[in-house]
Every structure is written in structure tokens, then in C-alpha cells.
Amino acid sequence: MKILLIGGGGREHAIAEGIKKSKHNPSLYALMAKKNPGIAALCEDFLLEKETEVEKVVEYAKARNIEMAFVGPEAPLAAGVADALWEAGIPVVGPKKSCAIIEFDKAWARNFMKKYGIEGCPEYEVFTEEKPAHDFIEKLGDVAVKPSGLTGGKGVKVMGDQLPDLKAAKAYTSELLEKGSVVIEERFIGEEFTLQAFVDGKSLVFFPAVQDHKRAYEGDLGPNTGGMGSYTDAGEILPFMLPEDLEKAKKIMQDTVKALSEETGIGYQGILYGQFILTASGPKVVEFNARFGDPEAMNVISLLETDFVDIMSAVVKGTLGNLPVSFSKKATVCKYAVPAGYPENPEKDSEVTVEDIGDASIYYASVYEKEGKVYTTSSRAIAVIGIAETIAAAEKIAQNALENLHGKLFFRKDIGTAALIQKRIDHMKELRG
């Protein structure tokens, strides 16, 4: 079977490995904006092209007689790549544009949740003008401010965090209003977690819960990033969660998929990503994404025991409910090595060498190859993942691998450590009283 992967990041490298491990021995093709050396090594052939060039994507897929496609990042979904491939007779794992809007229009997503009474929605309003927006900030007093469109996970600012006070919240709102509409919502206090699922339009197959670390520096300090690393526990839930927290989050996602079918008239087929915050009164929705998280994809794909291509086929055929899907009962810790100075002033074009990474797996993200050597760009460079019986053991494997990457790199040593996880557990105990 010929499969096309669209996208060229660390997440897509993990997806490519998942596809290549299949017993069906598929031929993998890729279309990516920049050459990812990890993906290129797994492919029969690849095309370097902007992933949002819809006609070029379809043209390449037809020329290579592609039988099924997987869209990795959000931008091509927002551009309608899935719609165009289906029209060309090529089934796609990745929702059509009318469903992917749940990620690329934050205002639409909140209004949709409200319309269908989906649990976990904050008090919020959407604004296009400054005065009513500022008045609403005064009314709520503790807010999150979001641009309506795609921001690569870096556009949201929260009071008590990136926004020190009401004045800062108003100033950021005014700045965003110059570019478009703004969503202002009540700020939730709690611990964030990610729940991802394969969706075939009706049925959902859930991956274990993951916790990502958005802040650049240790101790959850510094600016937001695309994600510095993430971990899963040996079961479905994280150490600070209760089983009922997971069940509530699953129900929210099931209700969302059902409501999307009702709203759009088509089934949501692909990956649904729920970003939740666990509060004293249960899980609330931070946002939905229409694709795997990066780094969270690395954690969960590495645990999958069921054939990845079988799952892809079930997603596009709508038969996911008949496929038993299983995961290895192990813990994972994923950590990103990023260029020194990232995210604000990253050192580009620095050579990276990889020594013995032991039992870890390695995924290339924003790097490039020149004369057989690997160099950094301005974004996250290389992810390593440790898999073991416990989070502590997985963390050691990942950390050891990072110590064997050489170059002008930086990483967070605290992700997956007992001290940081205990901090999360204590925080939730305190909130729950």
C-alpha cells in the first residue's frame, strides 16, 4: 500500500515510524516544506513543497498513485487539503476543513461548545472592539486572552502568568484586536493534560493521557513554546488524576464528535486532541486541536501495539468500533533539545551530533541536513523519548540520550522528574481540598 504523509516535523517523524512498522509493509511517501532527515530516510520518495499548496499536494498524490494519506500539522487541514484529497478519491486521516475549524477558529469553537451544551466551557465572549473587550476583562477580573486564529500554541496569554495584571491583559487585547477578533475567557486554575483520540466519524479510540510542558525553562518559567517535553504514566491516567477525571474528559470529546457531525453534516475523521485543565470541579476545555500534539504524538504512538495502518484504514472506512486497539502498559518521557536561546533568540545553523542514545528513540524536528551533517534552525530541534516500567526510569533514558546530543542546545532537565510530578500532585490535592 502507498501512503502519503503530509508534514515534516518531529510529530510527523513519529507518525512515519508508526506507519513503517506496519505488518502490511507500506511504501511511504512524504510532502514537507523542509527536508526532515528522519522522515526522508523512511520514504521511497518525498516532495519539498509548502504543505498548504493544496493543488500541488493532490498532484503529487495522484502522480505517486497514493492509496491513503495522513495529514500531520494543522495548517494544511485549515487550507482544505483533506477535502481536496477525498475529492480526488484518496482517503485521508485528518478532518475536512468544516470540522478542522474546531482548531483554527477559537471563537467558532467556543460558540459551538455553547450551542451544543458541551461540558467544560468557560465563561467567555468574542470581541472585535476595544471598549466592550476591556469592560469584560474588568467584569471577569481573571482572564485568558486568545487570538481567534492559529498561533502554533504561542498566542494565548493568561493573567497571573504572561499577563501580570488587568492593565497588561487590556494592552494585549488591544494589540490582538488590530489583527482580528479576540476571545476573552475566565481563567481556570489547575493542572493541564492532553487527551488524544483516533476518530472515524462516530467511534473514538483514546490514547493514554499526556502532560506537556509549554514553558521554556525549568520550574515552568519563561516564555511559552510549542512544547518542551511530555510524559505518560504506565496506565491511562497521570499521577495527579483520578479515573473519573479521565472518564469526564472522554465524555466531553465523544459529545464533541457527535455535535460536529450534527453541525457540519459530515463525520470527523482523523485525530482529535483535547487540551484540558483539571480544576477543583473536574476537567475543563482549554482548546481542541484537529491533529496530534507535538511532542505528545511521540509519547502515545510509541505505546501503540495495534498496527498503525490497520487503525488508519479503520478511521477512513468508519470501522474503528470493530477494531480492538491496545497500548503497552509502560510510561514514557519525551524531551526536546532546542537551539540555545530558544524561543526568543535561537542560535541557528549550529551543528548537532548524536552519540550513543542507549535505549531512547530519537525524532528529528526543525533541523536540516547539509553534506551529511545535521544543523539547527530557529525552532525545536530533536526530541528523544524514553520508555520504561515507570516514569522515573523513562526519564533517566531520555535524559541520558539528551546528554549524548552535542551542539549549541538547551533542554529542560526537570520534565518527568519525581520533584516536578510531586508538585503537580500537591497542587491538585490543594485545589480539591
Curated annotation (Swiss-Prot):
<keyword id="KW-0067">ATP-binding</keyword>
<dbReference type="InterPro" id="IPR020562">
    <property type="entry name" value="PRibGlycinamide_synth_N"/>
</dbReference>
<keyword id="KW-0658">Purine biosynthesis</keyword>
<dbReference type="InterPro" id="IPR000115">
    <property type="entry name" value="PRibGlycinamide_synth"/>
</dbReference>
<keyword id="KW-0547">Nucleotide-binding</keyword>
<protein>
    <recommendedName>
        <fullName>Phosphoribosylamine--glycine ligase</fullName>
        <ecNumber>6.3.4.13</ecNumber>
    </recommendedName>
</protein>
<feature type="binding site">
    <location>
        <begin position="137"/>
        <end position="194"/>
    </location>
    <ligand>
        <name>ATP</name>
    </ligand>
</feature>
<feature type="domain" description="ATP-grasp">
    <location>
        <begin position="110"/>
        <end position="317"/>
    </location>
</feature>
<feature type="binding site">
    <location>
        <position position="275"/>
    </location>
    <ligand>
        <name>Mn(2+) 1</name>
    </ligand>
</feature>
<feature type="binding site">
    <location>
        <position position="287"/>
    </location>
    <ligand>
        <name>Mn(2+) 1</name>
    </ligand>
</feature>
<dbReference type="GO" id="GO:0009113">
    <property type="term" value="P:purine nucleobase biosynthetic process"/>
</dbReference>
<dbReference type="InterPro" id="IPR013815">
    <property type="entry name" value="ATP_grasp_subdomain_1"/>
</dbReference>
<dbReference type="GO" id="GO:0006189">
    <property type="term" value="P:'de novo' IMP biosynthetic process"/>
</dbReference>
<comment type="pathway">
    <text>Purine metabolism; IMP biosynthesis via de novo pathway; N(1)-(5-phospho-D-ribosyl)glycinamide from 5-phospho-alpha-D-ribose 1-diphosphate: step 2/2.</text>
</comment>
<keyword id="KW-0479">Metal-binding</keyword>
<keyword id="KW-0460">Magnesium</keyword>
<dbReference type="InterPro" id="IPR020560">
    <property type="entry name" value="PRibGlycinamide_synth_C-dom"/>
</dbReference>
<feature type="binding site">
    <location>
        <position position="275"/>
    </location>
    <ligand>
        <name>Mg(2+) 1</name>
    </ligand>
</feature>
<dbReference type="InterPro" id="IPR011054">
    <property type="entry name" value="Rudment_hybrid_motif"/>
</dbReference>
<dbReference type="InterPro" id="IPR020561">
    <property type="entry name" value="PRibGlycinamid_synth_ATP-grasp"/>
</dbReference>
<feature type="binding site">
    <location>
        <position position="287"/>
    </location>
    <ligand>
        <name>Mn(2+) 2</name>
    </ligand>
</feature>
<dbReference type="InterPro" id="IPR011761">
    <property type="entry name" value="ATP-grasp"/>
</dbReference>
<keyword id="KW-0436">Ligase</keyword>
<dbReference type="InterPro" id="IPR020559">
    <property type="entry name" value="PRibGlycinamide_synth_CS"/>
</dbReference>
<dbReference type="GO" id="GO:0046872">
    <property type="term" value="F:metal ion binding"/>
</dbReference>
<comment type="similarity">
    <text>Belongs to the GARS family.</text>
</comment>
<feature type="binding site">
    <location>
        <position position="287"/>
    </location>
    <ligand>
        <name>Mg(2+) 1</name>
    </ligand>
</feature>
<feature type="binding site">
    <location>
        <position position="289"/>
    </location>
    <ligand>
        <name>Mn(2+) 2</name>
    </ligand>
</feature>
<feature type="binding site">
    <location>
        <position position="289"/>
    </location>
    <ligand>
        <name>Mg(2+) 2</name>
    </ligand>
</feature>
<keyword id="KW-0464">Manganese</keyword>
<dbReference type="GO" id="GO:0005524">
    <property type="term" value="F:ATP binding"/>
</dbReference>
<dbReference type="Pfam" id="PF02843">
    <property type="entry name" value="GARS_C"/>
</dbReference>
<dbReference type="InterPro" id="IPR016185">
    <property type="entry name" value="PreATP-grasp_dom_sf"/>
</dbReference>
<feature type="binding site">
    <location>
        <position position="287"/>
    </location>
    <ligand>
        <name>Mg(2+) 2</name>
    </ligand>
</feature>
<dbReference type="Pfam" id="PF01071">
    <property type="entry name" value="GARS_A"/>
</dbReference>
<dbReference type="Pfam" id="PF02844">
    <property type="entry name" value="GARS_N"/>
</dbReference>
<dbReference type="GO" id="GO:0004637">
    <property type="term" value="F:phosphoribosylamine-glycine ligase activity"/>
</dbReference>
<dbReference type="InterPro" id="IPR037123">
    <property type="entry name" value="PRibGlycinamide_synth_C_sf"/>
</dbReference>
